[in-house]
């Protein structure tokens, strides 16, 4: 008897192929098509993106860490059980924890800003839907009255979902967690675009389940930040935050992103110590006009009012364009 040969795996189920160098193009496309399908199903069209450090903890977490370190230091002093090297490391850990305590206000303020934006976004979605319904009725009446068969009543965009703008973060701890937390406190949905890292950045618990994503490729993750983003908020952070800020600024400066996108740089004192934007302009590395791409802010209320006014202005401009260009 001839032995029955096992079926070969289908290509799209062949894990060995999918994880090989030859399967890279499929993996890249998957990180475009799968998020696109899920976001469309959730009716997410516009986001407000929060960038910032994963290391900025909540005041409660920092206080607990600092207390634990000080207790360890006190116990070691009583027993004289630490070497000079370990004692110096403990002292440095306490110094860092004290610095993190100063920065922890950004966690609270990030959560508050996300809450304010989400509450406004939910209210705006309902208001926009009502306006769109009126506009549709008026267009339909005009179409009959004036006998204009080509007027497309559906050209008036509606945002019938419950949230006009959805808060989007990198999905991890720190400022990312604060953003998702604030959105949840407001009763809204929020997105987490996580990234697989060697030290395992786990998704925070405040992300909406169906909007929790995990990326392998940084550039595909960045694409979704930029593509859906209608406003950016940059909180204090390290290399990753700097990379995200400057990539978005470069795309806007060079016209690769053609949409108007308000950018709030949050924490003036921190950022002016890290980057001297004025000196970049002084040396001619950027233009004076480029400085207008950034709005510095130091309170949730100021950042909220700026983003709200800018997005409202841009939204009304789009609405006017659509009403005057029914085939757009």
Predicted segments — roles?
Residues 2-11, 15-189:
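Glycine-rich beta-alpha loop segments
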Residues 40-43, 157-162, 184, 204-206, ...:
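Solvent-exposed alpha-helices and their adjacent loops that cap or buttress functional pockets
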Residues 61, 242-246:
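Glycine/threonine-rich flexible loop motifs
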Residues 112-122, 245-253, 275-281:
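Short, well-ordered amphipathic alpha-helices
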Residues 168-169, 173-235, 246, 271:
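Phosphate/pyrophosphate-binding betaalpha-module
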Residues 189-200, 235-236, 249-277, 288-289:
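Short, acidic/small-residue loops that bind anionic groups at enzyme active sites
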Residues 265-328:
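C-terminal functional extensions of proteins
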């Amino acid at each position: 008897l001839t032995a029955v040969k096992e079926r070969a795996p289908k290509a799209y189920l062949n894990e060995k192929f999918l994880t090989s160098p030859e399967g890279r193009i499929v993996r890249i496309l998957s990180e475009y098509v799968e998020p696109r399908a899920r976001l469309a199903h959730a009716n997410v069209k516009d986001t407000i993106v929060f960038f910032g450090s994963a290391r900025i903890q909540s005041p409660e977490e920092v206080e607990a860490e600092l207390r634990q370190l000080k207790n360890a230091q006190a116990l070691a002093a009583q027993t004289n059980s630490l070497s000079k090297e370990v004692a110096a490391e403990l002292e440095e850990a306490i110094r860092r924890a004290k610095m993190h305590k100063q920065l922890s206000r950004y966690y609270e303020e990030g959560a508050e800003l996300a809450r304010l934006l989400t509450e406004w976004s939910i209210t705006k979605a309902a208001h926009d839907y009502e306006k769109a319904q009126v506009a549709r009725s008026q267009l339909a009446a005009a179409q009959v009255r004036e006998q204009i068969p080509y007027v497309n009543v559906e050209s008036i965009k509606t945002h019938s979902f419950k949230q006009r703008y959805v808060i989007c973060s990198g999905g991890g701890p720190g400022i990312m967690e604060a953003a998702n937390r604030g959105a949840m406190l407001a009763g809204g949905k929020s997105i987490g675009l996580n990234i697989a890292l060697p030290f395992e950045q786990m998704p925070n618990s405040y992300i909406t389940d169906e909007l929790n994503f995990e990326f392998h490729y940084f550039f595909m993750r960045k694409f979704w930040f930029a593509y859906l983003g209608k406003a950016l908020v940059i909180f204090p952070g390290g290399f990753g935050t700097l990379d995200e800020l400057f990539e978005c600024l470069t795309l806007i400066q060079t016209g690769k992103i053609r949409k108007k996108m308000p950018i709030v740089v949050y924490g003036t004192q921190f950022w002016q110590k890290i980057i001297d934007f004025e000196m970049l302009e002084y040396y001619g590395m950027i233009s004076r006009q480029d400085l207008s791409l950034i709005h510095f802010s130091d309170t949730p209320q100021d950042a909220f009012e700026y983003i709200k006014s800018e997005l409202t202005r841009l939204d009304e401009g789009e609405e006017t364009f659509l009403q005057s260009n029914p085939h757009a």
